[in-house]
Amino acid sequence: MARSNLFSDLEIAAFRAGITPRTKESIAWFKQKAAQLGKVTGGTIFRDEQVKMQNSLRNPLGNMYMFYYNAKHRNTLPYFDAFPLVVITSLAEGGFYGLNLHYLPPQLRAKALNGLMGSEGLPAKYYKPTIHRYLTTQVRSKFALIDKPEWEIATFLPAAQWRGAGVGKVYRDSRSKMRNG
């Protein structure tokens, strides 16, 4: 199967448009381009030639990954993301904890990304809805490692695959968690 060039095509388009990476202007530009793409599937991302596929996590802390996931307690959870975008924060028995940026609306996602990239971010309470535990036994694919230069692109790709609820409910619940601390 041919490899796609989603990440490099977007990077080249940004360069041609004179967009400086990791700026407010670039965040707005990538959000607009992502909206124009429509739905992006995991297959599209997995076939991208810039994405490194891994069978297991090697030195995962602080790295961003995408993967297919089938929550162990999917029948009792109100919803979950079956294709999360996770920055791994810690290892745990049988899995890991991470920040799934898909749980944040795009504006807050941009601010969270700024914080993760080392510039002005959000207060800690804003990350609360993104913190999730993932069990490695429930991962249903290889791990797609997203290199830091592509974090900005990956953050705004419309790739979340919600099970149990729509994106509107997820964002409302996330905002509620932020307000309530």
Protein language model regions, located:
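Short, solvent-exposed secondary-structure boundary/capping segments
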Residues: 94-102
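Hydrophobic beta-strand signal
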Residues: 64-71
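A short, compositionally biased
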Residues: 60-61, 91-95
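Intrinsically disordered, low-complexity, charged/polar segments
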Residues: 103-181
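Mixed-charge, Lys/Arg-rich low-complexity intrinsically disordered regions
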Residues: 3-64
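General detector of folded, globular domains
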Residues: 85-87, 99-100, 115-117
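Intrinsically disordered, low-complexity coil segments
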Residues: 72-80, 107-111
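Short beta-strand-centered aromatic/proline hotspots
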Residues: 75-92
